[in-house]
């Protein structure tokens, strides 16, 4: 092939252009080298995604990005994580404030909960950062569609998540669409095919594998540890995770059966969880009550949560039906040590919170969501 033809092919490749800062200012010296590299890249990009694993420092990177870009910025975070941002900002000398609505804005940088975004005039912000942006993965959801539409003209956009596509690689399309890189439909048409007549089963085309990941690398950076960018992993290697399995025997037959059988389908697993609540709660309560250390107890059913709260005297319970004020107060109280035990569901309190003071947790059974298990 001639040089001219190679140049022609290069121009035909799909690479999203940078739209951010032509030159990046000096960054906070408290950032680790891998964090500084990622922030500089995201500032040059303008619309970028930081898909960094848990513990890599997405919070400081998001705040530094927000601080160094030139516009008013709003950061959206899960419940109680917003207040965590404020505490972290103080450590890094970043002027950031929490607000519940438009009237509460006092700084150039504002952090709020996802649930409260509709209380703001979003067109006044020139920058937005989504913490735990995997919230966008449910493309058919009205909220995801609203988010994409609300920020489609915002010049600086940042997505951050350790699990951007926990179920299927095609979920990356909603992140790309939010950032204005490419719509989900365009991504599927260009890089994906579906098997047979089931259009929900998409996979990357064999010949498009390299092109797809090259395109991804033009707008997203993905790392699991600093050495992925050539830096030392010192301080980022977590201690080994010790998992202890406690088996609860169930002898009573499930509904519709003459005797107890192994749960195979989703419906059978759900029935087994409901039928064994009492035994599982009792086993967990014995374990937690015999300890004097901070403890996180994860459950999936409201009945489990209520039974656990009754069986563990010094626990605070966080349910989905609670007010936002109660949820925030309970989670912050657990973080501050006012409560030794917190009982909640991974989908409520399992995303984004830094709970390093608590080394012990119990799962009163597991759901079918790997993302919830990994994040919590």
Residue ranges and their predicted role:
Residues 369-376:
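Conserved SF2 helicase motif VI
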Residues 296-298, 306-309, 313-349, 372:
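Conserved helicase ATPase core of P-loop NTP-dependent helicases/translocases
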Residues 268, 272-300:
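Conserved interdomain hinge at the start of the Helicase C-terminal
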Residues 80-103, 179-182:
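Conserved helix-turn-beta segment of the N-terminal RecA-like "Helicase ATP-binding" lobe
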Residues 70-73, 91, 127, 135, ...:
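Conserved P-loop NTPase motor "coupling/switch" region that bridges the ATPase
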Residues 45-65:
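Walker A/P-loop
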Residues 9-51:
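Conserved pre-motif I regulatory segment
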Residues 59-64, 70-92, 166-171, 300-302:
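Conserved Walker A/P-loop ATP-binding site and its immediately adjacent core
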């Amino acid at each position: 092939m001639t040089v001219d033809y190679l140049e022609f092919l290069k121009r035909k490749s799909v690479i999203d252009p940078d739209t951010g800062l032509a030159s990046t200012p000096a960054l906070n010296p408290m950032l680790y080298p891998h964090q500084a590299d990622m922030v500089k890249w995201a500032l040059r990009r303008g619309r970028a995604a930081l898909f960094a694993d848990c513990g890599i420092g997405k919070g400081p990177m998001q705040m530094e990005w927000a601080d160094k870009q030139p516009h008013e910025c709003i950061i959206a975070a899960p419940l109680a994580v917003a207040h965590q941002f404020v505490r972290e900002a103080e450590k890094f000398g970043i002027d950031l404030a929490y607000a519940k609505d438009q009237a509460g804005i006092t700084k150039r940088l504002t952090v709020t909960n996802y649930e409260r975004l509709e209380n703001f005039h979003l067109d006044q912000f020139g920058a937005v950062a989504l913490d735990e942006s995997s919230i966008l993965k449910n493309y058919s959801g009205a909220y995801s569609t609203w988010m994409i539409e609300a920020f489609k003209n915002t010049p600086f956009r940042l997505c951050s998540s350790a699990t951007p596509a926990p179920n299927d690689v095609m979920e990356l399309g909603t992140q790309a669409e939010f950032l204005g890189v490419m719509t989900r439909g365009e991504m599927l048409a260009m890089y994906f095919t579906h098997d047979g007549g089931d259009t929900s089963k998409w996979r990357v085309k064999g010949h498009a594998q390299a092109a797809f990941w090259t395109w991804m690398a033009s707008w997203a950076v993905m790392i699991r540890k600093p050495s992925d960018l050539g830096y030392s992993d010192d301080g980022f290697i977590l201690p080994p995770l010790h998992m202890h399995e406690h088996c609860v025997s169930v002898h009573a037959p499930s509904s519709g059966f003459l005797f107890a059988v192994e749960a195979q389908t989703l419906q059978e697993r759900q029935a087994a969880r409901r039928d064994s609540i009492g035994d599982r709660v009792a086993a967990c309560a014995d374990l937690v009550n015999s300890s004097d250390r901070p403890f996180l107890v994860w459950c999936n059913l409201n009945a489990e949560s209520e039974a656990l709260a009754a069986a563990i005297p010094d626990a605070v319970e966080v349910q989905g039906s609670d007010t936002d004020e109660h949820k925030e107060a309970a989670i912050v109280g657990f973080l501050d040590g006012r409560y030794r035990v917190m009982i909640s569901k991974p989908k409520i309190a399992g995303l984004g919170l830094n709970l390093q003071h608590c080394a012990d947790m119990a799962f009163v059974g597991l759901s079918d969501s790997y993302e919830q298990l990994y994040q919590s």
